[in-house]
Design a protein with these regions (language model features):
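Single conserved hydrophobic/aromatic residue that forms the stacking wall/gate
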Residues: 1-5
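C-terminal substrate-binding subdomain of Rossmann-fold SDR/epimerase-dehydratase oxidoreductases
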Residues: 6, 10, 14, 25-146
Length: 146
């Protein structure tokens, strides 16, 4: 009865192909950050500890309702904003490099967490920048840059 949307945080793989890990690894290595499209497409990211709390709330819930319950963060950021924030938080000199947007890439991804709020009393608590800082620290360790 649940669905986790766009998780991020420590434990991500270096080469998993996801936006957050790709951008952080590129910035920490001093590489330019690759953006597909013009960077205006939006995404929502939920820190892993928030998702774990949501899963636990779902398992412990005795609420009787129908639906999948979206666990995610409704805060929406453009890909360009995320890249610039990661560059700043990493203290990197990376620049943005733009490539064509794949045809099947959606312009927007944002979860509706209404059921999670109403039936589980759950919503994410970790702000994007706080989660990014922790994830950057994790990747510094993975890359041996600590």
């Amino acid at each position: 009865r649940q669905m986790c949307i766009r998780d991020s945080g420590p434990g991500m793989q270096l080469n998993d192909g996801r936006v957050i890990s790709n951008f952080i690894v590129q910035a920490l290595r001093g590489e330019d950050i690759t953006i597909y499209g013009d960077g205006s497409q939006t995404r929502s990211f939920c820190f892993v500890s928030d998702l774990v709390e949501g899963v636990v709330a779902m398992m412990e819930s005795s609420a009787d309702f129908v639906g999948p319950v979206n666990l995610g963060n409704p805060g929406e950021y453009s890909i360009g904003e995320i890249a610039e924030t990661i560059i700043r938080l990493c203290g990197a000199q990376s620049r943005l490099s733009y490539l064509p947007l794949p045809e099947d890439d959606p312009r927007q991804r944002q979860p509706d967490i209404t059921l999670a709020r109403e039936h589980l009393g759950w919503q994410p608590r970790i702000a994007l920048e706080d989660g990014l800082r922790e994830t950057i620290d994790y990747f510094r360790g993975v890359l041996g840059l600590s």
